Amino acid sequence: MKTSHNRANKQRKRNKIANKIFLLVLLFIFGFFGYKYINSRPAEYSQMIPQKYILRDFDELCNQIESSYMNLPQTKKYKDIDFLSLKPNFKSKIKLESGKKKDEMSTQEVFDLYNDILKKLYDSNVRIADKQTFNEILQQDNHNQILNNLSIKRYSNLAEEIPEKTFRAYSIDNYKDALYVKVSDFDSVNIQQDAQIFSNILKTNKKKNKIIIDFRDNDSDNLDYAINVIIKPLLKSDINVEFNVANKTQPIISKNILNRNGISFKTTENVSNIKINDNQKSIKYITIFNLVIKKSEEQKCDVYILQNKNTRNSADFVCQIANRTKFATTVGETTSGNGLNIVHTYKALPNTGLIVEYPLGQGLNEDGTTNEEVGTIPAIKLDDNSEIVKLLLSRIN
């Protein structure tokens, strides 16, 4: 009996120990998954953004760039910078800067910090969208696919950029039979007003038989301006032109800006009939854009566009359309490109609500080369210097 009693006591002790171990395991499991749940929940809005959310969204930002942004090879090749390999350095910078603010930062501070880091891509088209861009996204038909619940609250805390000028001041010079107009940028408070000013300049000088438009050092990104202010009044006849953009992922494209500028598009997974380089192995989709523009003036002059290595974005777009349709003759140096990929993609980050903006694809030149890498080659090659107008006139007169 005594032995049986001892066995029972030992069994009870073993059961108690087993129960304690079981409870400890349960507590560990609940604690572990509870911690994971708490730390994986989307952030709730607060005026200040905790460091953990800033770091988490920076990871997401890098993931988007790695999966969808196509110009990383160019950055590595021409700037000798491997952006993604620098990610630990960037995260250390985030920890350092947020540590100065008690491990939390304001919306404006995170906005500035992310954009400062993104400068290392050497592409002004990759950025955290500003408040003006956010307001434009709100008007897009696909804004629900872009924004999250935090975005509207977060962007209410961002400062609105005040335009530095309220009207367009073109630099004009007159030669014997040529009008010269310098267009240094496409920044505009009122595109309709600028279009009227530019049109009046052309009408006032309609006795000239040559128009020289200077886009050197113009890197503006404003498709509305490029089409409505510059191209339309310079056309001698209507134009209808196609151009292609290559993508790694299925593009989400808002029709708003395209429809109002006479641009239609279709995206296809069949790239067999598209001229592309052998090194473009990551291309999965091609978006074919079709641009139709009706002439707005009775233009009879020959048009020449000056370009250099600093001409890019929407100014490069005008140069590309000029080369393809011959509405103007391009003159100068090869541009820096970025003109054909007219659509940016936007995605709100899950924990801060800030919006990442970047070109989703790469424009393809007519020979299949990448516009972002090769640029736009001028029809007439001339060195970029102060005598370029005189050199051009001596050649074409």
Give residue spans per PLM region.
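Conserved active-site segments centered on acidic
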Residues: 12
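Juxtamembrane/interface motifs at transmembrane-helix termini
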Residues: 378, 392-393
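Conserved acidic, small-residue-rich alpha-beta core segments centered on
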Residues: 36-39, 228-387
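Short, hydrophobic-biased amphipathic alpha-helical segments
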Residues: 113, 384-392
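Flexible, low-complexity junctional segments that flank or bridge functional domains
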Residues: 2, 7, 15-260, 302, ...
